Amino acid sequence: MKKQQRLVMRTVILLLLLAALGYTIYANFFTEKTAVAVGSTAPDFVLSDLEGREHRLTDYRGKGVFLNFWGTWCKPCEREMPYMNELYPIYQKQGVEILAVNVGEPKLNVEKFAERFGLTFPIVIDRQDQVLNAYGVGPLPTTFLIDKNGKVKKIITGTMTKEDIKQHLESIKP
């Protein structure tokens, strides 16, 4: 009886290891991962904002786009949002848009966060992580600076100071 229990346990462990190995191989070789590189055209997407309006990246052609991927739980994201909000009206008048892409959180959480900080720039939610994956985003926050022609000028991972954000917004003015 004891030998039979050991055999069953070994079989279960072996099956779990094989499943983990199979998943690892599948995830690394067969799933589509498109990392965006500096100089490439930013992948187009359509996402809805908190009011239900659709935002298509190509609709922003002719303007610089500060494309920021973030989460409400992300402390570095929380630190840079007020700076982005303060600079948004200044640079919007100069042809630069800030578009904040939340990474798949419930709309209510995002709305509460936006209200708490009084955010005025467009916030869209990537419910299925399709845009996140298309851009190859890893840690948050990650920001893509996109020029007026839709080309990625720079990719920034990690939190930014107000001065950093200002310099980046300056760099993508049309």
Swiss-Prot record:
GO molecular function: antioxidant activity; disulfide oxidoreductase activity
Disulfide bonding pattern of the chain: C74-C77
Coiled coil regions, renumbered to chain: none
Protein name, entry field: Thiol-disulfide oxidoreductase ResA
Lineage: superkingdom: Bacteria
Magnesium as UniProt keyword: no
Any GO BP annotation: cytochrome complex assembly
Protein species of origin: Geobacillus thermodenitrificans (strain NG80-2)
Protein task: Thiol-disulfide oxidoreductase which is required in disulfide reduction during c-type cytochrome synthesis. May accept reducing equivalents from CcdA, leading to breakage of disulfide bonds in apocytochrome c; following this reduction heme can be covalently attached.
Family of the protein in this entry: Belongs to the thioredoxin family. ResA subfamily.
Topological type in the membrane: Single-pass type II membrane protein
InterPro entries listed in its UniProt record: AhpC/TSA, Thiol-dS_OxRdtase_ResA, Thioredoxin-like_sf, Thioredoxin_domain, Thioredoxin_ResA/DsbE_sf
Classification via Gene3D superfamilies: Glutaredoxin
Domain Thioredoxin: start-end pairs: 36-174
Compartment list: Cell membrane
One cellular component term from this protein's GO annotations in UniProt: plasma membrane
Pathway(s) of this molecule: Protein modification; cytochrome c assembly
Keywords: Cell membrane, Cytochrome c-type biogenesis, Disulfide bond, Membrane, Oxidoreductase, Redox-active center, Signal-anchor, Transmembrane, Transmembrane helix
Transmembrane stretches, start-end: 11-30
Xref: Pfam families: AhpC-TSA
